[in-house]
Amino acid sequence: MKSAHMVAGYELRPSASWRIMTEAYYQKHYNIPIGPANTTTPFLLHNSQINEISGFVNDSLTSDGKGRSYGLELTIEKSLTNGIYLMSTTSIYQSKYTGRDGIERDSRFNGRFVQNILAGKEWKVGKNKTSIFAANIKLLAAGGNRTTPIDLEKSRTAGKTVYDWSKSYSEQLPHYFRTDARLSFTKNKKRTTSTISLDIQNVSNRLNAFDRYYELKKDKITLITQTGLLPILNYRLEF
């Protein structure tokens, strides 16, 4: 697979600690592996290697596929001053592909928007103000990945998940949302630096969607979700 990129950007610095950046981009993808010219297999006819997340397809492919993606990004950043830092990145985009059938479709990853916010505060503490207590938070919101409809009747007959590839990636999973928080204490000595931290991933315990499949025992389409809340305690000693 090959790509050609076009990017235009603008940067504004209203003060020494603030920076605002905008960027528009267009990417053209070509030589993407797709099904052979004479294929009648639905998966190969309507799909593209650009959508794969689990490795390569074990089929004969040709590099005739194409795709494109384009979007706008806005980044607002405040560098660390007075113990406070902030960065926000907003992206709106489109991601398309064209398979062997010649139809342009949404790619698996066409969530259409991503919002990242990272903020933190540091306090110098201790007798000589050489130790640092810090609190950080990170928020991520994004459009859900796209998925191919499951043919329920054919899945029942086959006893396993059967997709309707003629409608490849025409449906979208629920939007993704996750908040991570971190508290840390760093003690600086003459010859060593020690840090103890508590990271809480997915603070809201939201079970974000990953994919769907046909569950034979329950005779229904079931949503696969990702990991919920996960606390991680760390200690690091540097010499």
Where are these regions (language model features)?
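Outer-membrane beta-barrel architecture
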Residues: 7-11, 23, 63, 73-75, ...
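Gram-negative outer-membrane beta-barrel transporters
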Residues: 25-28, 47, 51-129, 134-143
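Residues that define the transmembrane beta-barrel architecture of outer-membrane proteins
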Residues: 2-6, 66-70, 107-115, 131, ...
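Membrane-embedded beta-barrel scaffold of Gram-negative outer-membrane proteins
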Residues: 1-57, 205
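Outer-membrane beta-barrel strand-turn architecture
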Residues: 2, 12-16, 28, 76-82, ...
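C-terminal beta-signal and adjacent terminal beta-strands/loops
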Residues: 86, 138-160, 174-180, 185-239
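Outer-membrane beta-barrel translocator domains and adjoining extracellular loop/strand segments
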Residues: 33-39, 46-47, 93, 97-104, ...
